[in-house]
Amino acid sequence: DKDKKPILDVRELGIDFGGLTAVDGFNLMIGRNEITGLIGPNGAGKTTVFNLLTNVYQPTRGSILIDGMPTAGKKTYQVNRMGVARTFQNIRLFKEMSVIDNIKVGLHESMKYDLASSLIRLPNYWKEEKHCTERAFELLDIFHMADMAYTQAGSLPYGAQRRLEIMRALATSPKLLLLDEPAAGMNPSETAELTETIRRIRDEFNIAVLLIEHDMSLVMGICEG
């Protein structure tokens, strides 16, 4: 039964950098729609695990299955197409672009027109562009940011930039969303709002979430594993 198969199955994962073992014997299984927290002190290798799961680093040993499919030998963009999206500790937005255009960067993968259509603006291009804009506003509505759609991303408050980065990751329609310290730099009310947002993401998008977080109130509030 596909629904019972884990979305992420990691076995005995490890990586060495020169003579240094950064991660060793790491095992993790995440079911569909689960929210799981990865906690530990700084330097414990949590972000390295995220880099292994997205094939930024190739593991020295062990295996990773995404929805039953191995990631070994895949490029990062191929792992993304398998259904894995992530955010980063340090916000990585196109700060000169508008909020909605940042989301459209994520949506671009699913757009169904070729280069010729986009260059000469064939009807197919406009149809896809309209769909893309509608989809972006759906995300903005969920995050209560529709009124900021045409605001320059770099001028947003810190908490809103964090939410935008999550929206851009969701735009790729992932099965598994990796959040690297999503509450970093947020005040308590922003963190409480983020907690509700992550829960809503899981429920509305039908996806699993794995997060690295130091804020234990957030971890204890939403994580099931």
Residue spans for each PLM region:
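Glycine-rich phosphate-binding loops of nucleotide-dependent enzymes
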Residues: D1-G225
